[in-house]
Curated annotation (Swiss-Prot):
Region feature Actin-binding and polymerization, mapped onto this chain: 497-669
Short name of any one Pfam family annotated for the protein: SipA
UniProt family annotation: Belongs to the SipA/IpaA family.
One of the record's GO cellular component terms: extracellular region
Protein name per UniProt: Cell invasion protein SipA
Gene3D superfamilies from the UniProt entry: Salmonella invasion protein A, C-terminal actin-binding domain, SipA N-terminal domain-like
InterPro entries for this protein: SipA_actin-bd_C_sf, SipA_C, SipA_chaperone-bd, SipA_N
Sequence ranges of Basic and acidic residues compositional bias: 315-337
The keyword Lyase is assigned to this record: no
Compositional bias (Low complexity): 291-304, 417-429
Domain of life assignment: Bacteria
NCBIfam families, alphabetized: PRK15376.1 (NF011903)
Localization in the cell: Secreted
Length: 685
């Protein structure tokens, strides 16, 4: 009998819904606060350095800088404040924002600053003359204001020309300077004000990590759209001003760092003094309205019973059974609890009898470490006895770890047979480790085996180091493809002739200058190379993505001495930062590289390392692919010192500077009829 279940009516708490709604739409509330404060920025005073006040402060400072160029700044403020022409006021604020950024960009050039002040004086004179009335030349186009609008367009063109002449044609320097010189310092001042502390220089340099990554990617996508629009349609005061205004919203993208700080770590709040006079209600404080509920989900008490069979559709976790047949050494049903990994060794049959007409290679079970990193060793490999450890580590002796029986007439082309010989060594060695959490492969001590050369019934013994991890990766039936790829790419395979290791280029350590002993991970950068379809997309940033590939390719191998690795990591992080804001700032700094000799020396050092990279040819092919499919070399040359040095290191002859020869995709006939969208390429019909 099924009893009826009645849903309990929701409990309504006064003020709770409002509180939750306010917290859920905090960003929207901040944006609306910015709009409200922007309308009263001339008459009211902003109190306290709050994050949401920054856009209004920038607008106020821009208007003040422009109005100072006029004969009567107070009259200009009055005209602007009392005007009801919304479009006209917006046009003036856009001009003022670009004008103030131009003043900062031309601070080193007295001549450019004089020209700017002249343009500002003429513009403010037009404001006084126009009056910002209903029919204004600053608003929508009207036939009767055609002459005045022509003068304004001429002044806007002069402003853009002055900026281009003093930034090398790169208007993006304005937004970069705004972020590094004003946005980030303002964020630091807000933190210092709210927490009553002083930030050290290292903390200030890491403030960019406070910005939410997803929100930062949205800003980067908008920045790329702005660059493409500028390339296609040219520059305009409105477009550049709106781009600068977008940068002022960065403080609103901060994580809610204040709410995550424990209450006992916050400074004592300032309690206002009570007003003079009688206190109502006998001096009792009024209870606050509304209810604040903090919900904390504690998952520490959750227990997982691995003794039951759990089917996650992609993994099998069964720790209750370990079937081991000691009679024929069959490891076909070893199930290791590795949270998401099921290892099937059914293909590994280490029977004691082998056919002479077939080749059978048997390896001991790999050591698999889970998050506990607890291990146990095997007592006897010959009988197949296994101790049930928490992490499932299995150690075997050297004579049982690698066994290969090969028919010389059918399998061995060079006349060599690899066999295991008892008594070669009695030392216990572990083959390899697979960390189920990080998908990282660690090579244990190599096994010493004996290689017998078969030549006219003469045997010649050689000692070879054999570590074969590729069969292991191919037999991980339940391991995800990503983990398998990582295992095969990051593992160093050691053979008798040292092929396929970082030692295959012995001259590498001799040609890296001060970084003696520097070695790189092999093929680790291949995972960062995007697909051709992605390269053709609208929002693809060819420069940053390519430099990211180079940064990954220059990742030192763990065999590099620690002092050398630490020093090179510092150089790599400085020249190839994993931060778009820092990368743009470095690009702007390198535009006048002669004023920074230390930076130039570091660039030359990194270029020398790239020149002698063991996989330089592969990286050069990737560079040409970026140039061909994504137009990388359109960002080339003297305007981008960092990118040009990297390309010169990879392509020594400098042929990439020719440009169109490599940009075949962008120069195909009819490419102007191709529309590039997020989902691919489409032909115009």
């Amino acid at each position: 009998m099924v009893t009826s279940v009645r849903t309990q009516p929701p409990v309504i708490m006064p003020g709770m819904q409002t509180e939750i709604k306010t917290q859920a739409t905090n960003l929207a509330a901040n944006l609306s606060a910015v709009r409200e404060s922007a309308t009263t920025t001339l008459s009211g005073e902003i109190k306290g350095p709050q994050l949401e006040d920054f856009p209004a402060l920038i607008k106020q400072a821009s208007l003040d800088a422009l109005f100072k160029c006029g004969k009567d700044a107070e009259a200009l403020k009055e005209v602007f404040t009392n005007s009801n022409n919304v479009a006209g006021k917006k046009a003036i604020m856009e001009f003022a924002g670009l004008f103030r950024s131009a003043l900062n960009a031309t601070s080193d050039s007295p001549e450019a600053k004089t020209l700017l002040m002249k343009v500002g004086a003429e513009y403010t004179a037009q404001i006084i003359k126009d009056g910002l009335k209903e029919k204004s030349a600053f608003g929508p186009w009207l036939p009767e204001t055609k002459k005045a609008e022509a003068k304004l367009e001429n002044l806007e063109k002069q402003l853009l020309d002055i900026i281009k002449n003093n930034t090398g044609g790169e208007l993006s320097k304005l937004s970069t300077n705004l972020v590094m010189q004003e946005v980030m310092p303002y964020i630091a001042s807000c933190i210092e004000h709210n927490f009553g502390c002083t930030l050290d220089p290292l903390t200030r340099s890491n403030l960019t990590h406070l910005v939410d990554k997803a929100a930062a990617k949205a800003v980067e996508a908008l920045d790329m759209c702005h660059q493409k629009l500028t390339q296609e349609q040219g520059t305009s005061v409105g477009r550049e001003a709106r781009h600068l205004e977008m940068q002022t919203l960065i403080p609103l993208l901060l994580r809610n760092v204040f709410a995550q700080i424990p209450a006992d770590k916050l400074p004592d709040p300032k309690i206002p003094e009570p007003a003079a006079g009688p206190v109502p209600d006998g001096g009792k404080k009024a209870e606050p309205t509304g209810i604040n509920i903090n919900i904390n989900i504690d998952s520490s008490n959750h227990s997982v019973d691995n003794s039951k069979h759990i089917n996650n559709s992609r993994s099998h976790v069964d720790n209750s059974q370990r079937h081991i047949d000691n009679s024929n050494h069959d490891n076909s049903r070893k199930t290791i609890d590795n949270s998401r990994t099921f290892i099937d060794n059914s293909q590994r049959n280490g029977e004691s009898h082998h056919s002479t007409n077939s080749s059978n290679v048997s390896h001991s079970h790999s050591r698999v470490d889970s998050t506990t990193h607890q291990t146990e060793t095997a007592h006897s490999a010959s009988t197949g006895a296994i101790d049930h450890g928490i992490a499932g580590k299995i150690d075997v002796t050297a004579h049982a770890t690698a066994e290969a029986v090969t028919n010389a007439s059918s399998e061995s082309k060079d006349g060599k047979v690899v066999t295991s010989e008892k008594g070669t060594t009695g030392e216990t060695t572990s083959f390899d480790e697979v960390d189920g959490v990080t998908s990282k492969s660690i090579i244990g001590k190599p096994v010493q085996a004996t290689v017998h050369g078969v030549d006219d019934n003469k045997q010649q013994s050689q000692t070879a180091e054999i570590v074969n991890v590729k069969p292991l990766a191919s037999q991980l039936a339940g391991v995800e493809n990503v983990k398998t790829d990582t295992l095969q790419s990051d593992t160093t395979v050691i053979t008798g002739n040292k092929a396929g290791t970082t030692d295959n280029d012995n001259s590498q350590t001799d040609k890296t200058g001060p970084f003696s002993g520097l070695k790189f991970k092999q093929n680790s950068f291949l995972s960062t190379v995007p697909s051709v379809t992605n390269m053709h997309s609208m929002h693809f940033d060819a420069r940053e993505t390519f430099l990211g590939v180079i940064r990954k390719a220059l990742e030192p191998d763990t065999s590099t001495p620690f002092p050398v690795r630490r020093a090179f990591d510092g150089l790599r992080a400085e020249i190839l930062p994993n931060d778009t804001i820092k990368s743009a700032a470095l690009k702007a700094q390198c535009s006048d590289i002669d004023k920074h000799p230390e930076l130039k020396a570091k660039m030359e050092t990194l270029k020398e390392v790239i020149t002698h990279h063991p996989q330089k040819e592969k990286l050069a092919e990737i560079a040409l692919q970026f140039a061909r499919e994504a137009g990388l070399t359109r960002l080339k040359g003297e305007t981008d010192y960092v990118l040009s040095n990297v390309l010169d290191g990879l392509i020594g002859d400098g042929s990439w500077r020719a440009g169109p020869a490599y940009e075949s995709y962008l120069n195909k006939p009819g490419v102007d009829r191709v529309i590039t969208t997020v989902d691919g390429l489409h032909m115009q019909r």
